[in-house]
Amino acid sequence: MLTHKTCQARKKMQVSFVIRDAEEKQHRNGVNALQLDSNNGKLYSAGRDAIIRVWNTRTEANEKYIQSMEHHNDWVNDIVLCCNGRNLISASCDTTVKVWNAHKGFCMSTLRTHRDYVQALAYAKDREQVASAGLDKAIFLWDVNTLTALTASNNTVTTSSLTGSKDSIYSLAMNPSGTVIVSGSTENILRIWDPRTCMRSMKLRGHTENVRCLVVSPDGNQVVSGSSDGTIKVWNLGQQRCIQTIHVHKEGVWSLLMSENFQYIISGSRDRNIIVTEMRNPSNKMLVCEEKAPVLSLGYNIDKTGVWATTWNSDIRCWKLPMYDRCVLSSGGMDAQWTLGGTELACIKGGAAIKECTVLNDKRYIITKDSQDQVVVYDVLRVTKKEELGVVDYEEEVKKRNKQVYIPNWFTVDLKTGMPTIVLGQEEVDCFAAWVSIEAGLPECDDPTTEIKINYGKLLLEALLEYWTPPHSMPPNEMEPDVRGNGYFQVPKHTPVIFSEVGGRTVCRLLVRDAAGDSESTLLHETAPQWVTDVVIERNIPKFLKIPFFLQPHPQMTKPERTKKDRLVANEFIQCRKVCEHVLEKVLNAETTPSAGNANNSLQNSQSDANSEGSQLPAEERIELWCNDVIVDPNMDLRTVRHFIWKQSTDLTFQYKTKQNFNFDGSIGDSLERVTRKY
């Protein structure tokens, strides 16, 4: 017997996975941050699709993709290159900070100190120090050399914290020498610390909305801030005041980039404009370009003749900067003459983000519509894309594909990353709620009367964790096969599987194929919730859900022997043909020919009543069930009748009558609960 660690007081857990291609070469959502390694021309982009991608900006070819860096499972909000480009630090909405080998693209370690979204990073190059901050109001300082030395055995790291923030932090900046660190938050103020002592030195007021972006001058004497109030402010830290307010945007300023001499500001805004402004003479400004969506991040190209820009869209574009002898932005000449910029120098095309999703009534397929109006059908159970429909009428496709069948919700869909993320849990939506007949599409089965039932949630969890062999588990009995998976299908091995707290932090992320690894297996053993191990390891069967209902004769019955209602209970997936059989056999005491799956009973009944032609007919051809004055299809299950026909919160009520006259004595038999157990 395997002993599973339940992680004591840990919060309730959920399991999620992403339906996606094995390699996603394009961003599928907005891009939050950029970092350029000028040594080799590699551009790193932090996506809202949870993926960091690396691009070769030195090639003229359209294909600039080098590799993806994957380990986050929510928006990557910020990244910084450190150690002369050898390492990269990332911050994410999954509440983690991750340390990467930038050249090889793998995650070296994960820091879980923050308790909410990590929004911003700051880097002091001369000291190899990184700061992280987020919605938990906390700022932590990290020694990069210590972070990059972490191993599985040497996994302890100490951090300093900067306290005093009273609201969520959205921006952070340090100068290269690490003498000043500045934070901006929804307090609408700037807080300044000395990171060497972790002491707060001052706070600066002036903005009227959230401070979204910050830059500190190399000498640590000045700070430039951009705010959702639409202004750019220049602050003198020695004087502890704002010395310049710049109004060049109509909406919030979300990104700032400074010239090397700290004289020119390149700003990107929610108004979609990128503008170059001379700091000492704000009237000396020029529009670089108007993007197609709000601007999220800016970064120089290699020779600083252009600026890379990211937006809410997934494309990354490089725009030519207005120049004069290639040195307007660095010369600081007051009488320099602007030359026309705004030419698109390069474009890294992104993919479409899914914006709409409908779960079909069968609770197996979902239909999505993306930002390019492409409509796609996904198979949630098999974790695959089923059909690309192209640009079609979305609502019409949903209507056309929705069947009149009711199956309980057993998963939810999250589109935050731009790709369909399916969430399984035990809270508001029970992932074991969907019991269906096997003809729902697993093996070839065209018989609607089949008695075999399957549970979608159980099958899917078994497929997602097919390769998991728990440590310290008992060796399989030689007489019993080592059963893995669900016996019906497998899911793509590249599928990311995430274990996380409900509404909270990520605990574990791995690919389906990696569950066989020793470290991953141990991690799963320590983090997987009991409801997962119950079905995947212990092979327990989820409980059936039952429906109470009343059964009474129809007013048109010719010889109703009983007029009283009988209250019965049955599994919710029982088809109405079973109710017909119950009426015929137990209420009317007639001979029946049960549906497929009861061959022995069928043969016995045939032999005992071979001379009765009517008794050879199935029960559903001899009995009519009515509900709310509607004849019920015998292939419908109880939950579908309750949802589509009964439509009331009270107990479901059926009326029955015969389609032709039969002799019966009218005695009532066992309850349907007892009958359904026989099948």
Curated annotation (Swiss-Prot):
Q: Where is this region: Disordered?
A: 594-615
InterPro entries assigned: G-protein_beta_WD-40_rep, WD40/YVTN_repeat-like_dom_sf, WD40_repeat_CS, WD40_repeat_dom_sf, WD40_rpt, WDR48, WDR48/Bun107
Q: Which Pfam families does this one have? A: DUF3337, WD40
* Record's keyword annotation contains Protein biosynthesis: no
Classification via CDD domains = Ubl_WDR48 (cd17041), WD40 (cd00200)
**PROSITE patterns to which the protein is assigned, alphabetical:** WD_REPEATS_1, WD_REPEATS_2, WD_REPEATS_REGION
Q: Where are the WD repeats?
A: 26-65, 71-110, 113-152, 164-203, 206-245, 248-287, 290-329, 349-388
User: In its keyword annotation, does this UniProt entry include Repeat?
Assistant: yes
Keywords from the UniProt entry: Repeat, Ubl conjugation pathway, WD repeat
Please give the Gene Ontology molecular function terms for this protein.
ubiquitin binding
A GO biological process held by the record: double-strand break repair via homologous recombination
Family, per entry: Belongs to the WD repeat WDR48 family.
Q: What does this protein do?
A: Regulatory component of the Usp12-46 deubiquitylase complex. activates deubiquitination by increasing the catalytic turnover without increasing the affinity of deubiquitinating enzymes for the substrate. The complex deubiquitylates the wg/wingless-signaling receptor arr/arrow, which stabilizes the receptor and increases its concentration at the cell surface; this enhances the sensitivity of cells to wg/wingless-signal stimulation.
What does the subunit comment say? Catalytic component of the Usp12-46 deubiquitylase complex consisting of Usp12-46, Wdr20 and Uaf1; regulatory subunit that, together wtih Wdr20, stabilizes Usp12-46. The Usp12-46 deubiquitylase complex associates with arr/arrow; the interaction leads to deubiquitination and stabilization of arr/arrow.
The protein in question is named WD repeat-containing protein 48 homolog
Give the species this sequence originates from: Drosophila mojavensis (Fruit fly)
What is this organism's lineage? Eukaryota, Metazoa, Ecdysozoa, Arthropoda, Hexapoda
